[in-house]
Amino acid sequence: YRENIDYGSKSLTIIGENRETTIIDGNNSGRGAELAGQSILSTFTIQNGSGNNGGNAVHASGNAILDNLIITSNSNTLGNGSVMLEANTVLKNSLIVNNQDVGVVCNGADATISNVTIASNTGAGIELKSLGGSNSHPTLINSIVYGNQDNNNIQFSAPSGHSINISYSLIQGGQDSITTYTNDTLSWGTGNLDVDPLFADTANGDYRVNVLSPVINAGHPDSTDSDGTRADMGAYPYLKTYNGPVWFVDAVNGSNFGSSGSSVNAFAAITPAIKFASSGDSINVAAGTYVENLDFEGKNLKLVGADAATTIIDGDSSGTVIRM
């Protein structure tokens, strides 16, 4: 859909069929979408938005909700964000990547950002601004901010007085990478990580995560993914489709991308089998060399190799090989 969508003063809900295939293309002639009030925009890719104002892809204000979106390949020359959030907006379950600008600008916003991946943008991942005079006080939870080309994945802008609450999120560089100014407040909560999220293939735009990723089951313990397990961080949850009680690992024929651990869809490493298994389950490991350090996580598990001579767990001289 090559158009620029403006909700005007209406509170509307617009939902696409599939976020991968239902595309709003701004045709490099303005914002992809602008909405306010109680409006909802959900399940689209928004691309090729452009302009010098805030939110070249999406500008949301009021109590608007942005849900299940892919926002990519948008450009802005003033650093006012591919997405601009104002007032009490919500951004969730969305991927914001490969934009020629800051990923998300919070402008005088008490916004909530949850289960969002913000990566590979040319500016900061998130920037707090007060272009209209009001400071920003967003909450970031269950999200990933990683690999943005500006050194600041989260950035405070003058004048001071902004605040952000971050919990159960992966922030590249961690707390020490975020510079605050006088009267700014950084609330660094529980459960945050500073590690590689192990994206599948960013060169080809695949921001799903490897089953070895530390973001799996690392979201807030009271939040869940659609499979009923503890929430992951980011826009692409790993959804459990197999429940054992026998798990399968094969270094040669298995995979750590999209695998379930079943006999026909084995993992390539032992660690994810331990992660998803329940106490009392068994893990059958095919012949091969597995370079990993294993922790049974307090579970009662049965780990069985194909043969002692050909099934090898190699700790790579980096710590205890097996903790059980």
What is each stretch, according to the model?
Residues I15, D25, V97, V105, ...:
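Residue-level detector of conserved, well-ordered beta-strand and adjacent loop positions
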Residues N204-W247, P272:
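Surface beta-loop-beta hairpin patches that serve as ligand-binding interfaces in beta-rich domains
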